Amino acid sequence: RRGRVVARLASVITDHADELAALESAENGVPIDIVRRFSVAAEARNLEYYASWIDKFGGEVVPLGTAGALDYTLPEPYGVVAVLTAYNTPSLFVGSKVGPALATGNAVVVKPSPLASLPALRFAELCQEAGLPAGAVNVVLGGAEVGQALVAHPGVDRVSFTGSRDAGREVSR
């Protein structure tokens, strides 16, 4: 089911490409056509790609050579993945980071750049339209203090960051 929902999200993103491109262009100044053909199209392709991998995650039973002994791999989600994105191609970043997190069964908290937050907010709404469960994708807004609080939160299990070198240093503390 998860694969179908993430694939549906890719389709919904494609259906709303003009709207998403207009939002991103209004905030970062990149021409709408470039945003539509590059960022938004890549966002949908990334989601399609990760949706196709959902049924391929697994492990191997490794023979141990000892009677009655069993060795196995159990793939489990991390839990909550924080996704911090930059202002220049927010749609591309969201698709490339949220896609694998959802594909592996994680919940996501997206913290977009304060300079380009509208695409992430609309993405979260489109997640609901595509059928993702409530709470699977969340968006928090704010500056560095919000990002720092998110990264330091004990309920956040993994962090994916794209941004400046200085901001990266802050995130990695």
Model feature map: region roles:
Residues R1-F57:
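Glycine-rich loop-to-alpha-helix module at the N-terminal edge of alpha/beta enzyme cores
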Residues G59-R173:
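Rossmann-like NAD(P) dinucleotide-binding subdomain of oxidoreductase/dehydrogenase enzymes
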